């Protein structure tokens, strides 16, 4: 992990195609702009955590017996 100190107007360059700029600092809030290619998904931390939790819940393992029954039902049709 890299920890950096930046002032308003200063930027951080990640790789060749991502630029993070500190736009404003007010109290304990920092306003950033992120310039990155469209194919790179950018999420706030709490949104990313919610997506990860939803994906984990959606990845429920099926009982193998249920899959076998489904296969047999499809073959009988």
Swiss-Prot record:
GO biological process: bacterial-type flagellum organization; mRNA catabolic process; negative regulation of translational initiation; regulation of bacterial-type flagellum assembly; regulation of carbohydrate metabolic process
Protein name listed in UniProt: Translational regulator CsrA
Chain's role: A translational regulator that binds mRNA to regulate translation initiation and/or mRNA stability. Usually binds in the 5'-UTR at or near the Shine-Dalgarno sequence preventing ribosome-binding, thus repressing translation. Its main target seems to be the major flagellin gene, while its function is anatagonized by FliW.
Molecular functions per Gene Ontology: mRNA 5'-UTR binding
Matches recorded under NCBIfam families: csrA (TIGR00202), PRK01712.1 (NF002469)
InterPro entries associated with the record: CsrA (IPR003751), CsrA_sf (IPR036107)
Keyword line: Bacterial flagellum biogenesis, Cytoplasm, Repressor, RNA-binding, Translation regulation
Source superkingdom: Bacteria
Cellular component aspect of the GO annotation: cytosol
Compartments, record wording: Cytoplasm
Protein family according to the UniProt entry: Belongs to the CsrA/RsmA family.
Pfam families: CsrA
Subunit-level organization: Homodimer; the beta-strands of each monomer intercalate to form a hydrophobic core, while the alpha-helices form wings that extend away from the core.
